[in-house]
Amino acid sequence: MERMNQKVGIVGLGLIGASLAKALSHRTDCTVYGLDIDRCTVEMALAEGTIAAELTDLGQLDVLIVALFPQATVEYIQENAEKLRKGCLVMDICGVKKQV
């Protein structure tokens, strides 16, 4: 059965993360939540409709997309893995890959 209106969280609203957030927000029925270290970036994403809300509850997500540098991605997932619900799909879209 296809799940409609999935809750998608995107951590890192730089060029790649914000582009994906905008595409998901405008072309799907997903509810997109976003998080970035820069508060102004989050506020701009909210104002432009790129995200529906700031990401504050990882446990509500169906999908978590991490758009950070590789080491920051590993650290973020290690620090927050227990907050994710069972069955949440976690993926990264790091622009640079190396063994971590």
Where are the regions that the model predicts?
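NAD(P)+-binding Rossmann beta1-loop-alpha1 motif at the extreme N-terminus of oxidoreductases
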Residues: 1-54
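A short helix->loop->beta-strand "cap" motif at the edges of active sites that frequently abuts
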Residues: 29, 84-88
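Short beta->alpha hinge that forms the Motif I/post-I loop of the SAM-binding pocket
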Residues: 37, 68, 93
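Conserved acidic residues
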Residues: 52, 62, 88
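A short, aliphatic-rich alpha-helical micro-motif
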Residues: 57-60, 84
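N-terminal Rossmann-like NAD(P) cofactor-binding module of classical short-chain dehydrogenase/reductase
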Residues: 64-65, 91
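Beta-loop-alpha module in the N-terminal Rossmann-like domain of NAD(P)-dependent dehydrogenases
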Residues: 67-79, 99
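Rossmann-fold NAD(P)-binding glycine/threonine-rich loop
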Residues: 94-100
